[in-house]
Amino acid sequence: MLGKIKPLSFPRDYDEFLSDEKNRRLLAAYREGMNATNVFYQALTFAKVIEGMTKTIPRPDNSGAIDSRRRYMSTRIPAELSDLPVTSNEIVETFRPFLGKKFSWVREHFRPLVRNAIAHLDPDEDTLDIDRIKDVQTCERAVPVLRYIARSLLLQGFEDWSNKATQHGST
């Protein structure tokens, strides 16, 4: 993969955020994706973070949850390539089909790739194969987008957690 990757950093009080087991597990999965050398594994772990973060977003039956849920559902890939925090032109181009799209739409777009083609192996079906360059390239194009969404959701989750902790006087 080409491009400069910005380290994931949290503002003050991050240690309390990290002490929550769910948060630690999500951050561990993100770290696994960042450190993996296999693009199939990167795609799978970033998809796991996205899935996990969407499950941590409060459902509308909880207090204050409607705003959090609405915020996630409306979070989008930037509409302009220049608004992406990516320096490599090659990687920026992988975002073009997703410009302005909601995270939830992009997540559903990649579901067949990650869930079916990577996570499962059915000898009778056409699944991704690490020995086919076309399949490796498919994952290479997906990983920057999945990484961007996973990172954005983690940061959004931290912000939501931090705001909730501040409201309850625990910071």
Task: List PLM regions with ranges.
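Amphipathic, oligomerization/interface secondary-structure segments
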Residues: 7-171
